[in-house]
């Protein structure tokens, strides 16, 4: 028996909407990353993008446990000497909560071209409104 390899025509993509209100960031990220990869489907293949689209709403209401809000930092390097920039999650959640949630989820995807392709299927919004009502997204509960 040969291994089944899904073709582009075989992949049926669905849209899910996830409410991040009072959900721990790590638990939210693992569930969403799993759906983006397609691990919930029987046709999952590690070397193909078979995942679904995910919309995360209320990104500003996500929870961080412990002292992560004050102590955890998001860093990036500008490329110049002394150009290591860092921002605490407390400041980041006030300034740009979408970036904090996106960074956590994309960090759990593969770090290659396939992971970048999967990350394009993620939409994160501040507040309960989103622009994807026409896609009829299913509500996904994360506890």
Curated annotation (Swiss-Prot):
SUPFAM superfamilies: Ribosomal protein L13 (SSF52161). One of its GO terms (cellular component) is cytosolic large ribosomal subunit. The keyword Iron does not apply. One of its GO terms (biological process) is negative regulation of translation. Keywords: Ribonucleoprotein, Ribosomal protein. The keyword Iron does not apply. Gene3D superfamilies: Ribosomal protein L13. It comes from the Bacteria. This protein is one of the early assembly proteins of the 50S ribosomal subunit, although it is not seen to bind rRNA by itself. It is important during the early stages of 50S assembly. Part of the 50S ribosomal subunit. Belongs to the universal ribosomal protein uL13 family. This is Large ribosomal subunit protein uL13. It comes from Finegoldia magna (strain ATCC 29328 / DSM 20472 / WAL 2508) (Peptostreptococcus magnus). The gene is rplM.
């Amino acid at each position: 028996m040969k291994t089944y390899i899904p073709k582009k025509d075989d992949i049926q993509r669905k849209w899910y909407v996830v409410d991040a209100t009072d959900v721990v960031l790590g638990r939210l990220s693992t569930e969403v990353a799993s759906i983006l990869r397609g691990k919930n489907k029987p046709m999952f293949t590690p070397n193909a993008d078979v995942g679904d689209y995910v919309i995360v709403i209320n990104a500003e209401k996500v929870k961080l446990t412990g002292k992560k809000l004050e102590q955890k930092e998001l860093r990036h390097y500008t490329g110049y000497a002394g150009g290591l920039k860092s921002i605490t999650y407390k400041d980041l959640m006030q300034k740009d909560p979408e970036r904090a949630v996106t960074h956590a989820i994309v960090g759990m995807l593969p770090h290659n071209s396939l992971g970048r392709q999967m990350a394009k299927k993620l939409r994160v919004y501040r507040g309960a409104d989103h622009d994807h009502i026409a896609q009829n997204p299913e509500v996904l509960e994360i506890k």
